[in-house]
Every structure is written in structure tokens, then in C-alpha cells.
Swiss-Prot record:
Belongs to the class-A beta-lactamase family. Interacts with LovF. This is Monacolin J acid methylbutanoyltransferase. It comes from the Eukaryota. Pfam families: Beta-lactamase (PF00144). Lovastatin acts as a hypolipidemic agent that works as inhibitor of (3S)-hydroxymethylglutaryl-coenzyme A (HMG-CoA) reductase (HMGR) which reduces HMG-CoA to mevalonate and is the key step in cholesterol biosynthesis. Lovastatin, simvastatin and related compounds are widely used to treat hypercholesteremia and reduce the risk of cardiovascular disease. Furthermore, statins such as lovastatin were found to be anticancer agents. Its EC number is 2.3.1.238. The lineage of its organism: Eukaryota, Fungi, Dikarya, Ascomycota, Pezizomycotina. The active site is at S76 (acyl-ester intermediate). 2-methylbutanoate binds at G366. Monacolin J acid methylbutanoyltransferase; part of the gene cluster that mediates the biosynthesis of lovastatin (also known as mevinolin, mevacor or monacolin K), a hypolipidemic inhibitor of (3S)-hydroxymethylglutaryl-coenzyme A (HMG-CoA) reductase (HMGR). The first step in the biosynthesis of lovastatin is the production of dihydromonacolin L acid by the lovastatin nonaketide synthase lovB and the trans-acting enoyl reductase lovC via condensation of one acetyl-CoA unit and 8 malonyl-CoA units. Dihydromonacolin L acid is released from lovB by the thioesterase lovG. InterPro entries: Beta-lactam-related, Beta-lactam/transpept-like, Diverse_Enzym_Activities. It comes from Aspergillus terreus (strain NIH 2624 / FGSC A1156). It catalyses: monacolin J carboxylate + (S)-2-methylbutanoyl-[2-methylbutanoate polyketide synthase] = lovastatin carboxylate + holo-[2-methylbutanoate polyketide synthase].
Length: 413
């Protein structure tokens, strides 16, 4: 009888998946991970924690465990939260998705477009053609880019026009000029940082207060904040950031500025710290369309492709040509995608009924955090690492293994 049970366990995809995570921890391929899955009905409530929250041993020579309530840096997984906050402002009539941002973000409206450099090396700046809307910001079609992703902005910074991100002031993040006009192309950039400023100006609240009152309070969340340094209860048990050395693959502690000081203001595109369990509450609320954060019709809008065909084609070409960035994390690179209000939308099933379905919404964060909400399958999943850089092959493969196992288990009932 024992051998029959052992054989059944060995064939169970969830057992095999969990074994893969434990082996990755034991072989020091990852410090730790938290993986979670929920369904609409409440029948699936899956959480597993593996390994440690740091590679640094404590005073007892132990590695403290990574747990479901360990405060972690969300990085760009913050963008979903800021999208929700902006859509709440829309629901309350404080801003319209297609209204120009001139009224609330005149500083953004006045920003020029960097076209290039003349023969003498001087920047060529021009006025923007067209008006930026909130929809442009939420879909990364405003013409803004991150400095590290765009050669024109890297050159602009090299000439001394921009401060280093080490200053950790939001103005340095918001200062770079645009690189194209609104609606001209899909470019990943500081759009959600600007959307966060829009929420602040529309409501008269800073983004931390707004987050606490409008996301944390409705969901009973107590460990989510932009202001980690002001939360000694979270600081004492937070995860460290770990970095994988590209030369030999070894892990090392990363003394990141994000953990040493709060930003001068709230970064709507990257600034939140949260326990994995609390972030899952947000995902599950959206999956259930329970009205605690957004009206059901607004949630439905998030899952509608928001790009016109030309922009959708350009975004797919850009993503296909950028495997080193791999915005979709574990998604197949050949998949047809669009962008919704909050993340990447799959325009086809990833693997029939055995993985994410057409219409699923996903994004992530730099420490290899990947979230996805799949309305058709009735599932949401979350893979939480605190290991950089993004698109780490070990984390990516483990995330795929996790999601496949959950879908297989769920299909079996």
C-alpha cells in the first residue's frame, strides 16, 4: 500500500512542484519564495512558503524564514495598486480616463519631447503633439520612458541633465523629458508615478494616506505601506533584497537604497512594501469582483484590451524583440498580447485549458514577483521572490512550474 501512495504522490504535479522549490532553496539557487493561489468560489486556498527572507544569518546563525506576512518590496507590482487608486478617482468623478491631465498635472503637460541631439551634442527638445490622458498613463502610451530603458534618455543623463536615482527623490524620476507623443507608441516608463501624483492632487491626500484608507482598510490589510521606515513593526521582519551574480550565479546580499530610506514622496510606480498575503487579498478582490475596491464594471474594464491595433502590434514587436527584459515573465515570448488597465492581457490561451486562459491579466515586479488574474479559469496566482535581477531564469522556471501545477490540480477538481 505504501508504494502505491508514494507512486501517486510522485505523479502529483503539486507535490513535484513543491519538491522543485525545496530543491532550489537547498541548492541555494534561491533564498526563498512564497506562492499562493485562490479561486472565485473559495474552494482553492493554496499557500506555501519556502526558504529564508535573506541570505544573511542572524545572531543565532539562523536564516529567518520567508513567510506569508513578511514585508517585501513590491517594486513595479506597486503599479496595480496605483492603477486601482486612479480608477477609484474615476469612479468618484474626480477625473475622467480620457480627460487631458492639464488640470491636475500641468507640469507633465508642459514637459517637452526629446528628439535627439545635434552635431554639437546638444539636446533637441520640442513641444509635445497631442494631450496626455489618464488612459495614456495607465497603459504606458503617454510617450514617457524609464531612463535605463531608452538610449536617448541615457545620453541625456550622461550629459548631466538628470540626477541619479540614488537621490531617491520622485522629482528625479519625473524629470526626464518624454521621448514621443501620447498615443504614438507603447513605452514602459514612469507613467504610474505620474498617475500617483494625479491621485494625490485629485484627492488632496498623499498616496500613503490614500492607500491606507481606500485599499488597506476595505480589505483589512495592516502590512502594506509606502513608508517602510515609519513602520518599525514591519522593518524588524522585512525581507532583504538578494542579487544573483551574473558571472557565477551565486547569491549575495544587496544593500539596496530602497530598504535604507523612504522616498521623499510616494512612488506610485514602485514604492510599496507588503506581505505576500496582503497583496493576494487585492488580487482575490479583483477576481471575485466583490466591489470592495472597484465596482464590478470597472474591474471588467481592466481586462479589456486598451490598445488600438497599431499600438498593439508595436507593443508585441517591442516585447518580442526584448527577451532580455521579458515584461511578461513566465509567459511564452510568442504569445499575442495587449495591454489593459493594470497589466498585460493574454489574447490567446497560453496552453489550452492547462494554463492561463485568453483574457488573463498579469504583471510583476523587479524582485521576480509575478501576479496574474484569470477570470475565465476563475483563478488568481502569485509568485513572490525577493531576488534580482528581474527575469531570473530560476525564478521564471519555478513560477511556470508553480502555475502549471495549480492549473492541473484545479482542472482535476
Amino acid at each position: 500500500m505504501g508504494s502505491i501512495i508514494d507512486a501517486a504522490a510522485a505523479a502529483d504535479p503539486v507535490v513535484l512542484m513543491e519538491t522543485a522549490f525545496r530543491k532550489a532553496v537547498k541548492s541555494r539557487q534561491i533564498p526563498g519564495a512564497v506562492i499562493m493561489a485562490r479561486d472565485c468560489s473559495g474552494n482553492l486556498n493554496y499557500t506555501r512558503c519556502f526558504g529564508a527572507r535573506t541570505v544573511r544569518r542572524d545572531e543565532c546563525n539562523q536564516l529567518p524564514p520567508l513567510q506569508v506576512d513578511t514585508p517585501c518590496r513590491l517594486a513595479s507590482a506597486t503599479k496595480l495598486l496605483t492603477t486601482i487608486m486612479a480608477l477609484q478617482c474615476m469612479e468618484r468623478g474626480l477625473v475622467d480616463l480620457d480627460e487631458t491631465v492639464d488640470r491636475l498635472l500641468p507640469d507633465l503637460s508642459a514637459m517637452p519631447v526629446l528628439e535627439g541631439f545635434d552635431d554639437a551634442g546638444n539636446a533637441r527638445l520640442r513641444e509635445r503633439r497631442g494631450k496626455i490622458t489618464l488612459r495614456h498613463l495607465l497603459t504606458h502610451t503617454s510617450g514617457l520612458s524609464y531612463v535605463f530603458l531608452h538610449p536617448l534618455l541615457r545620453e541625456y543623463m550622461a550629459q548631466g541633465h538628470l540626477q541619479s536615482a540614488e537621490k531617491f527623490g520622485i522629482q528625479s524620476r519625473l524629470a526626464p523629458p518624454a521621448v514621443n507623443d501620447p498615443g504614438a507608441e507603447w513605452i514602459y516608463g514612469a507613467n504610474l508615478d505620474w498617475a500617483g501624483k494625479l491621485v494625490e492632487r485629485a484627492t488632496g491626500l498623499d498616496l500613503e494616506q490614500y492607500l491606507q484608507e481606500n485599499i488597506c482598510a476595505p480589505l483589512g490589510i495592516t502590512d502594506m505601506t509606502f513608508k517602510l521606515q515609519q513602520r518599525p513593526d514591519m522593518l524588524a521582519r522585512r525581507a532583504d533584497q538578494t542579487h544573483r551574480n551574473s558571472a557565477d550565479g551565486r547569491l549575495r546580499y544587496d544593500d539596496s537604497v530602497y530598504f535604507r530610506a523612504d522616498g521623499e514622496e510616494c512612488f506610485g510606480g514602485q514604492g510599496v512594501f507588503s506581505g505576500p498575503g496582503s497583496y493576494m487579498k487585492v488580487l482575490h478582490s479583483l477576481l471575485k469582483r466583490d466591489g470592495l475596491l472597484l465596482q464590478p464594471q470597472t474591474v471588467d474594464m481592466m481586462f479589456q484590451p486598451a490598445l488600438e491595433p497599431r499600438l498593439e502590434e508595436q507593443m508585441n514587436q517591442h516585447m518580442d524583440a526584448s527577451p532580455h527584459i521579458n515584461y511578461g515573465g513566465p509567459m511564452p515570448m510568442v504569445l499575442r498580447r495587449s495591454f489593459g488597465l493594470g497589466g498585460i492581457i493574454a489574447l490567446e490561451d497560453l496552453d489550452g485549458e492547462d494554463w492561463r486562459r485568453k483574457g488573463s491579466l498579469t504583471f510583476g515586479g523587479g524582485p521576480n514577483i509575478v501576479w496574474q488574474i484569470d477570470p475565465k479559469a476563475g483563478l488568481c496566482t502569485l509568485a513572490f521572490f525577493q531576488l534580482e535581477p528581474w527575469n531570473d531564469p530560476v525564478c521564471r522556471d519555478l513560477t511556470r512550474t508553480f502555475e502549471h501545477a495549480i492549473y492541473a490540480q484545479y482542472q482535476q477538481g
